[in-house]
Amino acid sequence: MSSFAQTSLMATLNHEGTISTFYGVNALRQAHAAAVSGDVITLSSGTFLSTDITKAVTIRGAGMDVSKAYDIVSEPTVLGGNFNIKIPAEDTGRLTLEGIFHNGNIWFSEGQVKNALFLKSRFKDISQSGSCKVQDLTVLNCRISESINVEDGNSAQFLNSVVKTFYYGNMSFSHCVILDSDRVSNGGNEYKNCIIIDERGSVCFSSSSSAYNNLFISNNTNLLQYVPNNTNLRVPTSDERFAYLKGYNDSKDYKLTDQNRDVLKATDGGEIGIYGGSLPYSAIPTNPQITKFNVASKTTADGKLSVDIEVKSGE
């Protein structure tokens, strides 16, 4: 019997039901090069070299985080290196990124990205840096450790996500934790059921934005002077009940405690923050995971190569 090599880095490409397989750190690059818009690329755990995304494909990893609650895989899917998103305007497909960890820069640089979905992933910095049109980006169950900027005239919605800070664009936030509220003074945004931290105490909420059932942690007593409803609550930054929420760290879960969960209710009567609403935060990807992929070190006598694959379902 042949001995088996260690588990390999692997990417599978699904094109209309036909599966192609690629191996090693360049597997994502090779799969993307072979893909067409609408195809699905699934990555195993491990670190892959990133690639500029020029097609509206789905890229699914094994997860952005591994915790004791998530024992399906042993490590996340990491994309190494900065990359651009430059999908031609005539490509009407939907770009989806799920279950990945990225600690570099992502730029919307060319073409058009419409109705893209970033799901259950951890990003560092996402920005628009060129002529790219970003329309109706959805960020769901994600973490952004530094910032996101889609620029004026572009749009994004954030659902049950942790965002350190954001800059320009028409944005809506529901059940989010915003750790640096410097840009809540931007007009035209919407905030519902969020926890919003203002440690500087220097911002004032825009009269052209809307806010419902948000907890603001701020020393600025005039923060909400232009908000016509009384559904929001402001507490000072010295309030020890919420001190643990300040600052970004990948190890933080940003959960409300029994002590502060009932300080303010969401619009549906439930919990504010990322664990409330109909899409509570979870780092576990929705797609099945490749948990084992072993390849024999040599072929059999008849020239065949033994492969051992194990797949488990995600959420």
Where in the sequence are the language-model features?
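Predominantly extracellular beta-rich ligand-binding scaffolds that present long acidic/polar faces
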Residues: I106-E110, I126-K252
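C-terminal accessory segments
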Residues: N230-P285
